[in-house]
């Protein structure tokens, strides 16, 4: 049984959305998930203020263009070797419509582009993807920085998962393992230690033996990370590498993803802060904003 029985792909015809189509098609095919597609059209309030023939024709033209865009997206999925179970045309605020449809369908994963039609800097995400990431009931994959021609874009690529011992991170590791097995990708596990958590703050007399204690903590952490990697290998993931880094979890994850040429970063929805929602400034939110490649944020309960 697939880890995601249903995948919802949100598209708007932009370059970022085309990247999302490539990824959603590949994942749903490899994981044997049902793929649903939604195109959200903008409302045109001024049309509702008039009821003459000219504005009625204008409204019909917009609807025809939106239906054409939806149809083109379906064709693109099929051309990429995928199959669309059902497609939907919604009208309204994009993020709300995507989140509501995901809930209605009971999907396990939403895939969408990072910035819609606007060209913006790498450190920013579009308002739609940000809102969906924060409010969706399910896991979300932001297709940022994806290059279909890259050697890392298609399997065997490299998947980096950030772990910290939380239940959410464990769920992210399980998803990583399943995707790696299905696609033949390498799996990389990273745990980031924050040195300041171990450094004494009560005066020079407390520093005696601190370095020795910190080295012991690093050895224990390295052993734990390798143990997690070994567990993933026992689940028949062919290639698994473990990494221990010093620094903030978000910065360390973003750096390592670029260093190894990861094609996907996976992490849990809470991170180290114990937050119930993904909030601005959290590990998950920061990685989703700054990573060079697609980022999947996994909710603990998967469908």
What kind of region is each of these model predictions?
Residues 1-3, 16, 75-110, 230-265, ...:
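Structural beta-alpha unit
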Residues 3, 26-30, 95-149, 255-303:
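Gly/Ser-rich helix-loop-strand patches that form or flank binding pockets
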Residues 36-38, 85-90, 141, 190, ...:
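General small-molecule cofactor/ligand-binding pocket signal
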């Amino acid at each position: 049984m697939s880890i995601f029985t249903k995948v919802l792909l949100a598209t708007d015809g932009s370059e970022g959305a085309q990247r999302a189509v490539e990824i959603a098609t590949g994942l749903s095919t490899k994981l044997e998930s049902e793929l649903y597609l939604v195109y959200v059209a903008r409302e045109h309030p001024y049309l509702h203020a008039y009821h003459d023939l000219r504005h009625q024709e204008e409204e019909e033209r917009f609807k025809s263009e939106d239906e054409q865009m939806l149809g083109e997206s379906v064709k693109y999925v099929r051309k990429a070797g995928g199959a669309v179970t059902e497609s939907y045309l919604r009208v309204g605020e994009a993020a709300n419509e995507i989140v509501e449809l995901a809930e209605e369908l009971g999907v396990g994963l939403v895939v969408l582009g990072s910035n819609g039609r606007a060209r913006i800097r790498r450190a920013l995400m579009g308002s739609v993807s940000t809102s969906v990431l924060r409010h969706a009931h399910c896991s979300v994959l932001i297709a940022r920085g994806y290059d279909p021609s890259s050697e890392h874009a298609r399997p065997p690529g490299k998947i980096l998962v950030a772990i910290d011992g939380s239940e959410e991170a464990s769920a992210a590791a399980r998803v990583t393992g399943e995707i790696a097995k299905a696609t033949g990708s390498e799996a990389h596990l990273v745990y980031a230690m924050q040195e300041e958590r171990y450094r004494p703050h009560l005066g020079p007399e407390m520093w005696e033996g601190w370095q020795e204690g910190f080295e012991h903590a690093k050895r224990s952490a390295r052993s734990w990370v390798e143990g997690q990697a070994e567990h993933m290998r026992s689940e028949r993931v062919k290639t698994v590498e473990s990494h221990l880094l010093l620094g903030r979890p978000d910065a360390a994850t973003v750096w390592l993803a670029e260093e190894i040429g990861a094609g996907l970063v996976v992490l849990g929805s809470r991170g180290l802060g114990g937050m119930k929602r993904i909030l601005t400034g959290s590990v998950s939110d920061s990685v989703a904003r700054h990573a060079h490649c697609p980022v999947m944020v996994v909710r603990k309960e998967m469908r």
